[in-house]
Amino acid sequence: QDVDHVFLRF
């Protein structure tokens, strides 16, 4: 899922 990566991106 991209949701997990979205938080890391921030």
From Swiss-Prot:
The keyword Zinc does not apply. The modification Pyrrolidone carboxylic acid is found at Q1. It is found in: Secreted. Its main location: secreted. One of its GO terms (cellular component) is extracellular region. The modification Phenylalanine amide is found at F10. Keywords: Amidation, Neuropeptide, Pyrrolidone carboxylic acid, Secreted. The keyword Secreted applies. GO terms for biological process: neuropeptide signaling pathway. Belongs to the myosuppressin family. Myoinhibiting neuropeptide. This is Myosuppressin. It comes from Namaquaphasma ookiepense.
